[in-house]
Amino acid sequence: MPSGPVPAGTFGVGAAVTKPACAEPPSNYPPLKVPGTVVKDIDGLEAGTNHGTAADKYVYPASVVNQWLEKPATQPKNKKIAFVTFDDGPTTKFTGEQLDNLKKAGARATFFMIPPQMRDVNKNMLSRSLKMGNALAIHSYSHDYKYLYHGSAVDKAKHIGCDWDWAMAQSRAILGSNYFSSAFRHPGGHMSWTNLSQADAALAKRGVGWIDWNAMSGDADAQRPTTVPGYLQMVKKSIKESNNPNVVVILNHDTYGKQMTAEAMPSILAWLKSQGYEFGVIA
């Protein structure tokens, strides 16, 4: 996986934004319209990345973070890093509230977006996020479990690869032709599905690695917390159950109905800082 900005001409960086060759994955949004030309980068985007220059000091490739999760013995010994992540956005209300929380705490996060939803938010909010030092990664174009995971290993590889291509086209149509992310979070998490080795290889050919999590606020659980302190306790509990690692990747959501996640985030960020964690983002 790339360890720095991807050069123009690699993985489509800097090229005209066109529709992928494969059929468009299922989506609740109207069909994607692409300009067929090079798209100017949104203000704040560092070319060849999913973040701005403010994040250069604390950005890590998805492949590195994933190795830390799968092999805790490889984690840094001399520092603690918290990767706060948000799935299923962006949304004007809840992404905006989380940006306010991050700014007040002096923290940063990685937003795993469903790219068609970027059509619903003002570009200024996305630009603000980049300038604050956050990363804008990919959480799939379709978020359709049946499309992504049904069938054989070959089917899964075909569909996940195609989904990524459409997600990238949509992202570049809004963020600019120089956008690139090496980070993909599977809907439901990679850990939840089987026979994905060929899909992993399909992503790797595109310069992409997957990333799950080892801690959570519980905001998507069927029996989710019902109070702000409960969300913080869930984060503490899940970190403890992961044997208090030096690297934590915390699952949250910034989609509709996640008001309590937004209300709980200041206390979560403050607690992480009190435990000596610095904040990183995932490229």
What are these regions (language model features)?
Residues 119-124, 143-251, 255-273, 277-278, ...:
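Catalytic domains of cell-wall/extracellular-matrix polysaccharide-remodeling enzymes
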Residues 38-153, 170-182:
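Active-site beta->alpha N-cap acidic-glycine motif
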Residues 1-84, 91-97, 227-228, 233, ...:
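N-terminal pre-catalytic segment of deacetylase/amide-hydrolase enzymes
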